[in-house]
Amino acid sequence: MTTDQPVISLRPGGGGGGPRGGRLFAPAFAVAASGSGDFLRPHGGGAFRALQDWCLHLSHERVRYSRDQLLDLRKITDVTEQILRLQQEIEAELHGDDQSWVRNDSNVQLQTQTQTQVQAQNRFTETDNRDWRARTEKPPAPAVPEEKSWDNIREVKEQYNASGRQQEQFNRQDQSSSQKAQVGPPPALIKADVPWSARRGNLSEKDRVLKTVKGILNKLTPEKFDLLKGELLDSGITTADILKDVISLIFEKAVFEPTFCPMYAQLCSELNDNLPKFPSEEPGGKEITFKRVLLNNCQEAFEGADSLRVEIASLTGPDQEMEKRDKERIFKLRTLGNIRLIGELLKQKMVPEKIVHHIVKELLGSDKKACPDEEHVEAICQFFNTIGKQLDENPKSRRINDTYFVHLRELVANPQLTPRSKFMVRDLIDLRSNNWVPRRAEIKAKTISEIHTEAEKNLGLRPGATANMRNGRNAPGGPLSPGGFSVNRPGTGGMMPGMPGSRKMPGMPGLDNDNWEVQRSRSMPRGDPLRNQGSLINKVSSINKPSPINPRLLPQGTGALIGKSALLGTGGPPSRPSSITASPTPLPAQTTASPKPSSATPASVPIPDKAASSAKVIPAGLEKKTASLLEEYFGIRILDEAQQCIEELQSPDYHPEIVKEAINLALDKGASFVDPLVKLLEHLYTKKTFKTEDLENGCLLYGSLLEDIGIDLPKAPTQFGEVIARLILSCGLRFEAVEGILKAMEDTFFRKAIFTSVTKTLEADPAGQAILSSHAAVVDACNSLSI
């Protein structure tokens, strides 16, 4: 067995004993094996031979080196340039292809590393004359500083932050200065010839008025009409120039907001009646009035449509397509809006009918065989939808309308007419054949009260239920009952209104003499529904008519209360006795017996024969006709037409109910309808359609209902007192009737509110002061009722 020769390994894996070492280092040490070993001993071969001597005796056991041997090794630590090249080749072979990029720059890196190694060799080749055996004592450890307080730490932190901010500021200044040096000074600002300014306090009188008018028109709604109308009259329209600009603003608003055209037409009528006339700018010319300037604007807009149409047709370029569409849309809005405004002005008696016929002839054209433009056909349909009913009321205009509609029927058969226009013309013909009653409700501007009333009808709620929601009476939450009140509300006694301990709430069902539930409505007085209130027990049955209930809104299991019944035969509570109807003369008070226990067959309420004989039956459908004509009057406010409709009813015994319904509807709509209400009642009294007894009984009817109505309409007592006072001033109502109206209600709060409003309105007029002084006894009696 041969013994392996000890070979010193200067690198990992070196030596000749292993396959790795032979593969990697055999080529690299081939030079040394050939006998040229001077590259390992630059300082001579003596030291190297000594190293070889002790390496020959080296075994595989642990080797211990003496101090002298280590010092001998230090003498051969100089690394030559050839060894460094070998190092690079070995590392490249170890790392493989990943380090192939190193070889491309091997020359540059080799030079850099060579310089670094030479500097390190120069430092280590110097003779070290220090005494390694002598040990110097370590310097004493510095004393441990005392623990820093939080204040000291905070001060150091603040100083550090301050220095950082200063350094950042200096860097920013240096950066900005360098940028300025590179870019140069910023460009100078270009000032406009006429710079914008707020011009506060420098407005002219005309600009100030126009600015005020614009603000008023932007806030104008049917509910705020009366208030803003007064502000517009007081805005300062003092010259003809200002008047023309104001009319232009109103015209533009009305044209682009056709839904509000009725409101703007009414505004124009009010301004025409109240604004002054101005002298003509030309000698011998006509006066400048609101009506003349407004009609000139309408005429110019109507006649200028052809020039706009030609201008739009000239836009044929591909880049003008968007502009053409915008102008077509604006042209259509202006045309239809102008036609709608002219129609509404006709309703306000500001446009004569001859102008209307001239417009229709212009739109239809003289040639019956030619097909009008689509815009003209749509304008004709819009025109007749607005004023067709009013034109047909005049026999002469109706004959002219017949010729128009003959032309329209021929137009439907024209193949050149577009399908859309054909359907519009057919709808117009059907509308006239149906007496101008539309199939769908017309979309128009409404007040908040009208919106709530419509919602109550659609949902089957008790009248005024939405007012309770607005006032927060259902704040605790929970489902709503058909009367508009919370089912889970404390104190209501649950779902069953007749349970013991339940509170009587407005709108809850009452009980008749046989313990049958009777659904109460706003028109029913408080207490027992069969209990008389003076002369009120004999009034129209609509007072006691239950309000409709939508069965879909009721909880499950309650359908039997309002559905078909084997006992009743019909849905709902039992009908009231037929003898309880409207009567022109009050009946004596009747006492009601105590409630009888409920039985399978409800007993009829005994009514005296005298009451049955004196009762008169009201024609069916009279209530709906009354509500319809009152709604129409408050919409158009034409007194003669309202008078004609009431006279056509031919029911003088129903006049007190009409008075009551008129007051109820007007006060429910708001304070702006008090004046039209008083004008209507005064007009009907002056024309002898209504008598003094009709007005007194109607006010008495409404006064008996005010305790229920006042819950939803807190201002109703004050407004009702104003109506009474104004009727007294017009001699339509006797002052003694005030005492009877106050006695019809039990709540002293409502009595006081009504009488205070009556006296306040009368004291503001000299004639009213004379009435109060001449009826001192009645005033004292009314004061005692209000305490």
From Swiss-Prot:
Residues 210-435 form the MIF4G domain. PROSITE patterns: MI (PS51366). It holds the Pfam family MIF4G. Residues 112-121, 588-604 have a biased composition (Low complexity). Coiled coil: none annotated. One of its GO terms (biological process) is regulation of translation. The keyword Transferase does not apply. Residues 160-181, 532-547 have a biased composition (Polar residues). Residues 621-743 form the MI domain. GO terms for molecular function: mRNA binding; translation initiation factor activity. Residues 1-20, 112-196, 514-607 are annotated as: Disordered. Residues 125-138, 145-158 have a biased composition (Basic and acidic residues). Transmembrane segments: none annotated. GO terms for cellular component: eukaryotic translation initiation factor 4F complex. Keywords: Initiation factor, Protein biosynthesis, Translation regulation. EIF4F is a multi-subunit complex, the composition of which varies with external and internal environmental conditions. It is composed of at least EIF4A, EIF4E and EIF4G. In higher plants two isoforms of EIF4F have been identified, named isoform EIF4F and isoform EIF(iso)4F. Isoform EIF4F has subunits p220 and p26, whereas isoform EIF(iso)4F has subunits p82 and p28. Two forms of p82 have been identified, p82-34 and p82-16. Belongs to the eukaryotic initiation factor 4G family. This is Eukaryotic translation initiation factor isoform 4G-2. The lineage of its organism: Eukaryota, Viridiplantae, Streptophyta, Embryophyta, Tracheophyta.
